[in-house]
């Protein structure tokens, strides 16, 4: 006796849960698929894992995120936090060649007086009716929150959005 069977397995691509990551995270795009790798940014990355473009929760303290030059499209942040308080590098870097839109809630902090919380070397667009991006340097002697490198597109803000400076070190993008 024999039987033929077709088996189809569908898997749902999940959000990237930063609370489950214990190392630096690199975000990339392969065709239509968002990918991430978890490894020290300065070392060879491990195999990429797919995620659905949503990033949530808090990355381990002292770890960083890189959005590489293949990244093109919308990233949705669900109460995401990057707290790289002790690292001598930006907590979040957007590489030259990346063209990304941020939506949702993202808080990025650094505690190193010589570093920015966010360094934008690419194109960054802020979208969404309830989006809030916070970029803070928690070191009392620093005024560095966000850096926009020469040659990059600063920040595109949708209608009704504006950048607010709070104190000397914190910047928030507010949508009205």
Residue ranges and their predicted role:
Residues 7-176:
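A composition-driven surface/loop motif
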């Amino acid at each position: 006796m024999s039987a033929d069977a077709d088996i189809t397995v569908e898997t749902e691509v999940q959000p990237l849960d930063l609370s489950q990551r214990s190392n630096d995270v690199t975000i990339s795009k392969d065709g239509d698929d968002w990918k991430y790798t978890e490894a020290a940014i300065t070392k060879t990355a491990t195999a990429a894992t797919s995620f659905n473009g949503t990033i949530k929760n808090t990355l381990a303290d002292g770890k960083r995120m890189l959005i590489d030059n293949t990244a093109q499209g919308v990233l949705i942040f669900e109460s995401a936090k990057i707290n790289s308080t002790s690292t001598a590098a930006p907590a979040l870097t957007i590489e030259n060649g990346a063209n990304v839109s941020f939506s949702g809630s993202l808080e990025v902090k650094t505690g190193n007086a010589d570093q920015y919380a966010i360094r934008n070397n690419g194109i960054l667009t802020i979208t969404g009716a309830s989006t809030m991006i916070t970029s803070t340097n928690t070191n009392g002697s620093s005024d560095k929150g966000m850096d926009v490198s020469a040659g990059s597109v600063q920040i595109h803000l949708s209608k009704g959005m504006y950048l607010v400076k709070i104190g000397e070190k914190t910047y928030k993008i507010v949508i009205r």
